Amino acid sequence: MNQVMDMPLRRRRTRLPLAGALLAGMTALMLALASPAGAAEPGVVLADSFSPHVGDLKALGVHWVRVFATWSDLEPARGDYSANWIANYERLFHELPAGTKVIVDVVGTPQWETGSSDEHTPPANPEDYAAFVGGLAQRFGPHVTAYELWNEEDSPSWWVGAPDPAAYAALLKASYPVIKAAEPNATVLVGGLTGNDYPFLEELYQDGAKGYFDAVAVHTDTACNIVSPYSFLRENDGHMIPDSFLAYREVHNVMLANGDDKPIWMTELSWRTTSAECEEGFWAGQKAQGVTEQQQATYLEQAYHCLAQDPYVQVAIWFPLQDQGADVSGLLRANGSHKPSFAAMQAYARHGDQLTEACGSFSGPRIDVSAPADHATYSGTLPISVSARDPEGVGRITLEINGKLIRNYTNQAFPRTLAGALHWHGAAHIRPGRNVLTFIAVDKLRNTSQTSIVIYHRMHRGHRHKRRH
């Protein structure tokens, strides 16, 4: 592969690419000018053309770009490399601002490799993909900082058929040593996981992928994402759902659980600026697919504020720099004018995180028990009165006695205060003496809190206890 990458290259007509790269050098200086220590270094995806957007990148002050290299364009026939495409990348190496670091995401299987005209079909032979990306690493050398191996391999949109952790793990195992042999300093990334897909990552570890990547890439620009990065939901087991922005922390937890304290690179984050109706996923037809331009700017600030609190997230790339067609997530409008988010990114790149507010709400509701009093003694029916307050809204209060359910109070409107009261006749039938009454409250984000009090059941003389709980 390395020999053929140095051979004369056949000319091909240039199509609209997803591409770009870097002029190496001045790296130490640029790192000194980057965001403060511990904060994610910002960048943008160049998804529109081979135009390096030199003026915009200089104005933004970011020193990272992410681009796509489509295998089917670069090697349309086995061993036959497109001179035009290679030249386009190499031209960018010299046109991008000095010190720019480049992530190249290698996608797009050629038909000769799979027999399919759909370039999102995964490689039939991982060694073919490895040979190609290894050849790129040798050809591009230090001009490319990192290689992202595939894109959203956990999604059938990018991995035709069903996502296959074992097959993708094989791709990593084949590619990693080849890239490192060609360019030892290159960082090898797990392809961006759709919406922080930590269950898929767990399966990669089970399939032996540990040791075959240097960092895990995640994507948080999920379909119809219109909530603040501070907002999240939890699964019933307490873990954040993958589509929550902050679920990159669950990705990190999976890595640590597998003894793999490597960094995370967020290679796509964004919010669309549109009032059009959602057309994708579970929420299709049920809500808007985007936010206002000012909300986008606010969410950008909040996102980088959260990332600054987690130094294991080293790089965070906005997708894309400029709106293109139906994709209106850019910092620039299609005509090149600046959205408010451009200034927000510029401020972060120059001054770092300036927010001081909390990144999300992680505490459960405040529970107030009006009755009974702690260590109260009762006989017969027991009056119970409880309320829970939470700025995110309260969805449920659960009452338990000695770990057994008494009842739930629920309200799917998630009021800021939820209350419940009853005269519990079942209290007459619990065991005599000391009992523990527990109150559990859950907010809209599925944050949970609980409090318990002790009550003493004094039975009437002559009453025989019938065990209920």
What are these regions (language model features)?
Residues 126, 130, 164-294:
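Noncatalytic carbohydrate-binding groove/subsite architecture in carbohydrate-active enzymes
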Residues 153, 281, 285-368, 446:
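Aromatic-rich peripheral "rim/lid" segments of glycoside hydrolase catalytic domains that contact
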Residues 46-59, 128-136, 198-206, 297-306:
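Short, acidic/polar
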Residues 360-462:
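Long, low-complexity serine/threonine/glycine- and acidic-rich segments characteristic of extracellular
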Residues 60-196, 271-274, 319, 324:
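Substrate-binding cleft and catalytic face of glycoside hydrolase catalytic domains
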Residues 1-14:
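N-terminal secretory signal peptides that target proteins for export/translocation
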Residues 38-70:
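Boundary/entry segment of secreted carbohydrate-active catalytic domains
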Residues 19-34:
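Bacterial N-terminal signal peptides
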